[in-house]
Amino acid sequence: MEGFDTMALPYLASPLSLGNMQGTDYLNALQGMDLPDQRSNFDSETFVSGDDLTFAHLSPQTLKRFSSGYEDSFPEMVTSFDPPPPAEPPADSSIDHNNKLLSFSMPVYPWTLLDYSFRRASISISAQLHGMFFLAESPWTTSPTENAPPQQGAELTCYRRNLFQITGSVTLPRALRYIITDTGDRIPIVAHELTVSATESVEGNSVKIISVPWKTPAANDAGKDTGNSSNTAAKVEKEPPAIPLDMLTGQDLDADYATFPIAWKRLQFRVATANNGRRKELQQHFVVRLRVVATLSTGMKTPICEVHSGPVIVRGRSPRNFQSRKDLPLSGSAAASRKNAQAAAASNNLTRTSPSLTDKAKTVVKSSSPETSSNGVPQQSPPNWALATNSTLPPPTTTTLPHSSVYSQSSPEFSRPVEAHRRTTSAIAAPINLSLLDDDSLNLSNGDSRPHTSFSNDLASKSLSVDSGRPVKMRKVSHSMPQAQSRSTSATFLNTANFQQMLPVPFTSESADVLYEYFPLGLEDWQGPVDAVYRPHVVHHTNMPQMKYITARGQSKRYFAAEDVF
């Protein structure tokens, strides 16, 4: 290794002079290359660099479009391809998880199934739970989130009293004929049926599922049965019946397969699961199982296909015992639908307004009833029933008062002035006789009868009559229809008005209609003639005597007086 220079690079060109080399004509025979102008840092005479090498320049051919059958107006433009559509965002994972929680598993075959040609056959079962199911937070797991699967943070839960149903379909091959036992024997199949049952997860024991009837048997129907055995049988809880799978009655027109619908409604767990949230290792779950049971030629029944639901926790107590838990309703279950319905009902109740009493007070109802006016002498009444003002009534200008229909405004919406000097007329509210017989109006044996008067806004437009009666009845004033009695009525009216001016004024800023409002009666064609008893905030119906109604038929009557309202 003596004389070896470690800095020399033998794999490169030799650093010897070109003059000492023999046969260098091969360098001139090579064609030059059109390379970028990059000069070497080394001496060209001592090193063989790329500058001394030339190569032929090859120009690439331009791409040309194939000629089409028509003249292209834009030959330079190349049609651009449409980009692939963007991938759609995945749907909400909770919906998929909810469907998986409420649906059943893949079919499991305990036996090998064969058709008439001794080929293997299979059965398809597609079913789903429906009802008040929700995801309940477990005390030993984390709370459910949107990204985490519900199985990690919550479990499918329902209450025992809530009803549920199972819907779906089952498809069987029409050529299904044999089952193969463990010993290799072929046993023919005679019939098929679909059953529903449930088991618990701790020991695998069966759990009873009952079918709740639409209507409980009436007591009288149960009494018709003879014997205690019949009454006891009516109270026995019934299990959901099996669905027969008859190949001849299949709804599908397919020649190879028969499809049968599944519909079990109003199902209920008979008992609840134990240890709801107390100890994880002892938490009990219920599993709903659907089985296709085959009846063999030997008379034995055996399941040939089975699917099962997810584990379900059944609560037996009231929801208030689980208020500390977080419940997440499933979007595909009835729990979410009821929750949305309750929220909508609550919003409607906030915006809904009930009809006010003022609308009823403004309604005018006309009816015909006998008139009970009489020319009784008014007597003095206690000051507690009287209302008067500081002004006096002007004398009447005419003795003939034309009849008019003017009603008083008994409504809380009417605004009344507080000052007493703004009132120009007076009104009085006193108890009067409400008897429907004329004999009661002339009965003055009690000695403490009350006067009954009423005023109007326009004295020239009203005809009033005064009645007297027992003190236990309230005021009722009727308008007389004939104008012949207007003179006597006006005289009684003026005498009563002058007497009222001497009475004390217990309420100066209120009138009688504030304390006693009239609510008109709703009359129907089928109702008999009735009379209204004028009481505070209520109107009572009183049947009229037949003789009174016959004598006064055709006359009109008012149930309230047109009082002065300002």
UniProtKB/Swiss-Prot annotation:
GO terms for cellular component: cytoplasm; nuclear chromosome. The keyword Cell inner membrane does not apply. Residues 79-326 bind DNA. Its main location: nucleus. GO terms for biological process: meiotic cell cycle; positive regulation of transcription by RNA polymerase II. It comes from the Eukaryota. Residues 365-391, 403-413, 452-466 have a biased composition (Polar residues). PROSITE patterns: NDT80. Gene3D superfamilies: NDT80 DNA-binding domain. Residues 314-422, 448-470 are annotated as: Disordered. It is found in: Nucleus; Cytoplasm. InterPro entries: Fungal_trans_regulator (IPR052605), NDT80_DNA-bd_dom (IPR024061), NDT80_DNA-bd_dom_sf (IPR037141), p53-like_TF_DNA-bd_sf (IPR008967). Coiled coil: none annotated. One of its GO terms (molecular function) is DNA binding. Residues 333-349 have a biased composition (Low complexity). Keywords: Cytoplasm, DNA-binding, Nucleus, Transcription, Transcription regulation. Transcription factor that acts as a positive regulator of nonrepressible acid phosphatase activity. Is a major regulator of responses to nitrogen and carbon starvation and is essential for the expression of genes involved in vegetative incompatibility (like pin-c, het-6, and tol). Vegetative incompatibility is a non-self-recognition system ubiquitous in filamentous fungi which results in programmed cell death. This is Protein pacG. It comes from Emericella nidulans (strain FGSC A4 / ATCC 38163 / CBS 112.46 / NRRL 194 / M139) (Aspergillus nidulans). The lineage of its organism: Eukaryota, Fungi, Dikarya, Ascomycota, Pezizomycotina.
